Amino acid sequence: MHFRALLVSALATLAMAAPAPTLEARQSLSSNELENGPCRDVTFIFARGSTEQGNMGFIVGPPTCTALKLKLGSDKVACQGVGGAYTANLLPNFLSQNTDPKSIAAATDMFQLARTKCPNTKIVTGGYSQGSAVIDNSVKALDDDLKSRVKAAVLFGFTRNVVDRGQIPNYPKDQVKVYCAVGDMVCYNTLIITAAHLTYGIYANDAANFLVSKL
């Protein structure tokens, strides 16, 4: 319990230290272009980190979406955050999957929706912090047909990096890119939060390049 208190305190401190979102950024904290929009050539499904607002968060989800749209065309990419039962609460980080079953199911629902609503779309995905565990656990359990539609994944501050050896189990390793910032202890099988854990936005363009390269 003492460790949990330290984690909550660290997250609160870092959240206060993080730069305030601009108006444009605040407006992009959520994206539901798969659920509410037309089918597009590419669908990007993203799970935010613990305590982040909206369904895309602020740190790295929206900038990766923006980078994809700049590279492929805004009318070619649908960005969809994982919301619903995934509330990005802190405590599920301490479970064996580093998240909880309902959060994993919420991501799986989005992958299934992409297949049923937009059977011709190419799916790419990503997750940050707890969201990386959500995507990891969801993708590895997808049926073979749906998994084959997921062309690439980017994982930032991957909480299961050590446990899953820098990859998503039962998914092609060359279709996954893991980003672990120098000094981010989350990537090394701890839940110790440092300032490095807030830096992943700088990798958004590189992540988009990787996702595009796998289409």
UniProtKB/Swiss-Prot annotation:
SUPFAM superfamilies: alpha/beta-Hydrolases (SSF53474). The active site is at 129 (nucleophile), 184, 197 (proton donor/acceptor). Keywords: Disulfide bond, Hydrolase, Secreted, Serine esterase, Signal. Its EC number is 3.1.1.74. InterPro entries: AB_hydrolase_fold, Cutinase/axe, CUTINASE_1, Cutinase_monf. It catalyses: cutin + H2O = cutin monomers. PANTHER family: CUTINASE 1-RELATED, CUTINASE 2-RELATED. Belongs to the cutinase family. This is Probable cutinase 3. It comes from Aspergillus clavatus (strain ATCC 1007 / CBS 513.65 / DSM 816 / NCTC 3887 / NRRL 1 / QM 1276 / 107). The lineage of its organism: Eukaryota, Fungi, Dikarya, Ascomycota, Pezizomycotina.
